[in-house]
A protein has these predicted regions:
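Small/flexible residues
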Residues: 4-6, 167, 384
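Catalytic centers of hydrolytic enzymes
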Residues: 26-32, 36, 41-51, 55-67, ...
Length: 582
């Protein structure tokens, strides 16, 4: 009898449990994802190069993150997508000057509760000593599935991270643009190589699905949307991966400094959100992920994204107080006087002829290296160094990036080919005196400034030779090299020592490969000298030794015919800068 009663009770209990389970309510989990990318050292709302207040910054992002965490709590995930270690002197100071303190980029992201980071090409450019130290100091994993250790054949960094919130399992796969060998010397990434993004993503997607069985998969790619093939390598393959590798719900991208928020269909017909917050923490990617769960399983999910403007948020006083010592250290560093300059110089003149700004770079490169010819471009579209004291901050205007100085062997014919391609990207082929001298994006909207069709950091001129640029001629026929700067003959068949930065020397901008016609694999064999430190370091040393700089245009090149180019330069200067050419 007791046995029957026990069985009856058990059956009733099981029935109740089954009824309850069958009527279990669905549960919605909301997760907020905030992506920063290409912050480029813009940690404080102050430009330490131009010495003025600035937009964006992690100080504003902190205010936004705090606001979102009040709403979503631990379900608010801050993710960084790389290129955080180069740009402003704040990063440079903790990269190379104060190497004993915790790197400010690590300390700030730790403070803000970042859950995962990614490697960017400008992080790699700082070199192993810097990025290895920074990675160790981050309280979160820095990803890089396609950064491969030559010794093991395995990823040098953690390939993916698993994040769990309220029973929802999220996988984040990190990758970097594989085009780094096209820009950076091997010493900066020694012992490593970079796998193409699409095959890497395909392989890791299978591993993640099989091993982790996540509910949501996020791609964290330091690569732009699409295009730009460098040799056999695609620089920006994020869209290809989003469309061609089924499984991603969200793809967070960066690198190309271009805002984007769009949904694309993958090969299975499912939507994938692709979002890019551009650079300098002026906006962040703001993604809302809603997961509906029942019986411990995901039955529905939705993804919505937008770009949130950080300039609508106040600077976080809490953040600024916490990092006040670091702010002061950087401010003291950039305020140090290293010399004086006799006149104001600007890159604005560099597009229209020989200019004091670029010719100062040429002179320094030739003096430091002992080369016969120098190549250099305006690395900032509109940089200026004012007459008077030169401080460390001015050096970041004079030379924007941490490039090394190379000396390479080039033939006279290769020098001409290099310049032909450079000027074809920069100068229009004029058919009439009324045409533009510069190669602009057309049409130019009425009342708006003109923009170059191509990147101005690829507009190299030369020093050490006298030459003309005939803008009535097509590419391949524009450049006439008259002589060496000292008047001696220039020989198309002779090999010359050419000073240029490491970005260009490794094939950046394609001027050495497509222009000069040197095979990519041969470039490293042409390098006969490379500095140990970045070019800015040697420029600072040079100025401290000289004490007074008296820059002037060397007038070793000019646009012709003069009767066309001089009036056209005045018109185009006004279109570019909204002011008259002096």
């Amino acid at each position: 009898m007791k046995y029957r009663i026990c069985i009856s009770i058990l059956l009733v209990w099981v029935g109740v449990q089954l009824f309850a389970a069958g009527n279990q309510k669905e549960k919605e989990v909301v997760i907020k994802i905030i992506e920063t990318s290409d912050v480029h050292g813009n940690f404080f709302p102050y430009n330490f190069i131009e010495r003025k207040d600035w937009s964006g910054s992690l100080a504003r992002v902190h205010s936004f993150v705090k606001e979102q965490r009040k709403i979503y709590g631990d379900n608010c995930l801050l993710i960084d997508n790389g290129d955080i270690l180069q740009g402003q002197p704040t990063a440079y100071y903790y990269n190379f000057i104060d190497t004993l303190s915790t790197h400010v980029a690590a300390e700030m992201m730790n403070y803000m509760g970042c859950v995962v980071g990614n490697m960017g090409n400008h992080d790699v450019e700082t070199g192993h000593d810097v990025y290895d130290r920074w990675i160790k100091q981050c309280n979160f994993p820095v990803l890089g599935a396609n950064i491969i250790d030559n010794a093991t054949g395995q990823p040098y960094l953690q390939p993916y991270e698993i994040i769990e919130r309220e029973g929802v399992k999220i996988a984040v796969l990190g990758m970097i643009t594989p085009a780094i060998p096209s820009w950076l010397p091997e010493k900066l990434w020694s012992g490593l190589h970079f796998e193409e993004m699409e095959p890497c993503a395909r392989r890791w997607m299978e591993i993640i699905k099989e091993k982790e069985k996540p509910d949501v998969i996020i791609g964290l790619f330091h690569a732009g949307k699409s295009g730009n093939k460098l040799g056999n390598v695609i620089e920006d393959a994020s869209m290809n991966v989003a469309k061609n590798i089924p499984g991603f719900d969200i793809v967070l991208i960066g690198h190309d400094h271009s805002r984007e928020c769009v949904k694309v269909l993958n090969t299975e017909g499912k939507n994938v959100l692709v979002i890019d917050p551009a650079n300098n923490a002026n906006v962040v990617s703001d993604v809302t992920l809603k997961i509906t769960m029942k019986d411990g399983k995901v039955v529905a999910k939705s993804v919505d994204g937008k770009l949130a403007d950080m300039n609508k948020y106040p600077v976080s006083e809490e953040f600024m107080q916490h990092f006040a010592p670091q702010y002061k250290a950087v401010d003291d560093f950039v305020s140090r006087k290293i010399g004086t300059i006799s006149r104001t110089i600007s890159t604005k003149d560099a597009y229209f002829g020989s200019s004091p700004f670029i010719d100062l770079i040429h002179k320094l490169q030739l003096d430091i290296s002992g080369a016969e010819v120098s190549f250099s471009a305006p690395l900032s579209f509109r940089a200026e160094i004012k007459e008077g004291d030169i401080c460390v901050s001015d050096m970041f205007n004079l030379y924007k990036y941490e490039n090394m100085l190379y000396v390479m062997k080039l033939s006279g014919k290769e020098i001409k080919g290099f310049l032909e391609m450079s000027y074809a990207m920069w100068s229009n082929q004029m058919k009439t005196p009324e045409d533009h001298l510069m190669l602009f994006n057309e049409p130019i909207e009425k009342g708006k400034r003109a923009n170059f069709k191509n990147f101005s950091f690829n507009f190299d001129s030369a020093a050490g030779i006298n030459y003309t640029v005939d803008v009535t001629k097509p590419e391949g026929e524009k450049i006439t090299i008259l002589s060496m700067a000292d008047g001696t003959p220039f020989d198309m068949d002779k090999m010359y020592k050419v000073a240029l930065n490491s970005y260009r020397g490794n094939g950046g901008g394609d001027l050495l490969t497509a222009g000069a016609g040197i095979p990519k694999e041969e470039l490293s064999k042409r390098i006969i000298f490379a500095t140990d430190k970045d070019l800015r370091y040697y420029l600072m040393q040079y100025i401290e030794q000289e004490k007074v700089l008296q820059p002037h245009a060397m007038h070793q090149w000019k646009f012709i015919p003069k009767e066309w180019t001089v009036p056209a330069a005045k018109r185009d200067y006004q279109l570019l800068f909204g002011e008259e050419k002096k």
